[in-house]
Amino acid sequence: NALRYFRSGGQQMNGWRYMASPDDAEENWYYFKDGRAYSTSYKTTEACGYGIAKIKGETYCFDKKGRMRTGLVELSDGRKFYFDSDGKMKTGRIVVNDDNHDNEVFYFTTSGSIGKRGDGFTGVKDGSLYENGRLVSAEEGMKYEKVTVDGKTYVVNESGKVKTSGTVTDADGVKYKITKDPNGGY
């Protein structure tokens, strides 16, 4: 059931090809090795329904039909990865501008093995709080908000910065004295 591609002289295709597959009229990018498209089950590290592969120093994602994926990709286990419009995995802090997540800030891990590197980070990074990659912040109009992420309680401001000491008052007049608690939150 693998997608195969041969040139007119019968040579097996190697490299990138933008085309429609026989069972899909929509054109997509595919990467071929020895005439066969990279997919979830070929030349990739399988990650919950997708195949992730390093090609010429960049990391890409392919679905089971071999189509290169772009944008925010959510795996069946809930992990998220981000691939730019050229299909290259992005790591670190980025702003995602697409139809579903207009101007949202994410943080994707910068180290780890293939299939783990680039997944959405959960916890505090550079003073900001993230959950599955997405920046957690106080609701608009609230100066501070108490939130729970991964079983730990934090107080964050509208820009997602974690308050680590002192006393703060939220928009409803509720005061919070900030101290580090035993489970790692504040």
Segments the model singles out, each with a brief description of its role:
Residues 1-186:
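Extracellular adhesion/carbohydrate-binding repeat motifs centered on closely spaced tryptophans
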